Structures are given as structure tokens and as C-alpha cells.
Curated annotation (Swiss-Prot):
This is Ribonuclease P protein component. InterPro entries: Ribosomal_Su5_D2-typ_SF (IPR020568), Ribsml_uS5_D2-typ_fold_subgr (IPR014721), RNase_P (IPR000100). It comes from Clostridium botulinum (strain Eklund 17B / Type B). It comes from the Bacteria. Keywords: Endonuclease, Hydrolase, Nuclease, RNA-binding, tRNA processing. Consists of a catalytic RNA component (M1 or rnpB) and a protein subunit. The gene is rnpA. The keyword Nuclease applies. The keyword Oxidoreductase does not apply. One of its GO terms (molecular function) is 3'-tRNA processing endoribonuclease activity. GO terms for biological process: tRNA 5'-leader removal. Its EC number is 3.1.26.5. It catalyses: Endonucleolytic cleavage of RNA, removing 5'-extranucleotides from tRNA precursor. Belongs to the RnpA family. It holds the Pfam family Ribonuclease_P.
Amino acid sequence: MIYRLKKNIEFIIVYRRGKSFANKTLVLYVLKNKRNKDKDGIAYSKVGISVSKKVGNSVVRSKCKRLLSESFRLNYNNILKGYDCVFVARNPIRDSNYFETEKAMKNLIKKAGLYYDEENGIKSN
């Protein structure tokens, strides 16, 4: 299950206290959150997605959000748990397809040091 950042205050906290990483199409804000634990005490990560009106009309923005959500969902098992992540879409994302979006997302997650290769048990930096 993918947990979401929903409230404005959650986004603000990540923006202010988190660390940012950027590439051409995305900006990633990351904040370690020790309170992200389920009933069994297992840590999980939360994600928030922000797409500005500068990117395009509502159809384009929704498409971008769907692409980012799906990329995160499919790579969730390879991301270290216990973090709040906010992805902010930049203008060039409107012209990118799923594979380019996923590549940009993985690139930022690796830059942040959150990518964990399950097969090899290796944390990428």
C-alpha cells in the first residue's frame, strides 16, 4: 500500500525541513520521518506529488500525476522506508513519456541515497 502526504502542513514541513534534489523534469524533497510506522511497528514511506498550473491544463497535470504515482508504486519496494518524499513536476515533464518519467524519478531517488536494490541487497548513492 502506498501512503500519501495529503495535508498542506505535511507538504510545508517537507519543503522547509527536507533536503532537495533536482533534475530537468522533477524536484524531489526528502525528509526522514520516524513516526511513519504501521500497527506492527514497520516503517513506511509517504509520497506527495505536486504539479503546478504552469505545466499545463488540468488534463496534462493529471496525466503527469498519474505517471509519477505509477512510477513510485512500481519502485516502492526499492525505496528505503521511513521517509516523506515530495515530487514537484517541472515544465519539461509534459513532453515526457512513462519511461522518461520513471528514469528521472529513479535518478533522483538514487541521488538522495534512498534507492535499495533488493536483488543484490545494495543501497545506491
